[in-house]
Amino acid sequence: MALPCSFSVALVLLSCHSLCCLACHLPDTHGLRNWRVLTLLGQMRRLSAGSCDHYTNDFAFPKELFDGQRLQEAQALSVVHVMTQKVFHLFCPDTSSAPWNMTLLEELCSGLSEQLDDLEACPLQEAGLAETPLMHEDSTLRTYFQRISLYLQDRNHSPCAWEMVRAEIGRSFFSSTILQERIRRRK
């Protein structure tokens, strides 16, 4: 299903310059890749939300990590890195049981991999992360993704369970995009 035009335009505007201005000077293409990941997640939708009503779940997304008010640039960069890493490991294992179109899945995994390369090339010490312990933020995100993994296991990786996870990851990745834009605007 195609995203509404105004939503797509908003994603482009928010993502184009989202991380390029953080302390580590990520490439301009990083924000575009973020938009592409969101688009691919939307295109991967295979089931209508109504057909999976009995699968709804509150994964307790840690919104407080993405409000942009508490985090410094280096902390935001770390949160974005952990988030991207966890999404990659969720959708891109060597043997995926997900019911996705393989072409879309491969493109998603490629985009996430490129984003991780950008983030891992950023020297975190220069960004000030060496002085800023992020144990709580890291643990909170890991717990969130653990809940998602357990949900998939409990639901036997069914197509409806994957649809709920895809929608959840789309919302959380959008929050990551908003965080990146807020940090960029502070500069």
Swiss-Prot record:
<dbReference type="GO" id="GO:0002323">
    <property type="term" value="P:natural killer cell activation involved in immune response"/>
</dbReference>
<keyword id="KW-0325">Glycoprotein</keyword>
<dbReference type="GO" id="GO:0051607">
    <property type="term" value="P:defense response to virus"/>
</dbReference>
<feature type="disulfide bond">
    <location>
        <begin position="24"/>
        <end position="122"/>
    </location>
</feature>
<dbReference type="GO" id="GO:0002312">
    <property type="term" value="P:B cell activation involved in immune response"/>
</dbReference>
<keyword id="KW-0964">Secreted</keyword>
<dbReference type="GO" id="GO:0005132">
    <property type="term" value="F:type I interferon receptor binding"/>
</dbReference>
<dbReference type="GO" id="GO:0006959">
    <property type="term" value="P:humoral immune response"/>
</dbReference>
<feature type="signal peptide">
    <location>
        <begin position="1"/>
        <end position="23"/>
    </location>
</feature>
<feature type="disulfide bond">
    <location>
        <begin position="52"/>
        <end position="160"/>
    </location>
</feature>
<dbReference type="GO" id="GO:0002250">
    <property type="term" value="P:adaptive immune response"/>
</dbReference>
<keyword id="KW-1015">Disulfide bond</keyword>
<keyword id="KW-0051">Antiviral defense</keyword>
<keyword id="KW-0202">Cytokine</keyword>
<comment type="similarity">
    <text>Belongs to the alpha/beta interferon family.</text>
</comment>
<dbReference type="GO" id="GO:0043330">
    <property type="term" value="P:response to exogenous dsRNA"/>
</dbReference>
<protein>
    <recommendedName>
        <fullName>Interferon alpha-1/2</fullName>
    </recommendedName>
</protein>
<dbReference type="InterPro" id="IPR009079">
    <property type="entry name" value="4_helix_cytokine-like_core"/>
</dbReference>
<dbReference type="InterPro" id="IPR000471">
    <property type="entry name" value="Interferon_alpha/beta/delta"/>
</dbReference>
<keyword id="KW-0732">Signal</keyword>
<dbReference type="GO" id="GO:0002286">
    <property type="term" value="P:T cell activation involved in immune response"/>
</dbReference>
<dbReference type="GO" id="GO:0005125">
    <property type="term" value="F:cytokine activity"/>
</dbReference>
<feature type="glycosylation site" description="N-linked (GlcNAc...) asparagine">
    <location>
        <position position="101"/>
    </location>
</feature>
<comment type="function">
    <text>Produced by macrophages, IFN-alpha have antiviral activities. Interferon stimulates the production of two enzymes: a protein kinase and an oligoadenylate synthetase.</text>
</comment>
<dbReference type="GO" id="GO:0005615">
    <property type="term" value="C:extracellular space"/>
</dbReference>
<dbReference type="Pfam" id="PF00143">
    <property type="entry name" value="Interferon"/>
</dbReference>
<dbReference type="GO" id="GO:0060337">
    <property type="term" value="P:type I interferon-mediated signaling pathway"/>
</dbReference>
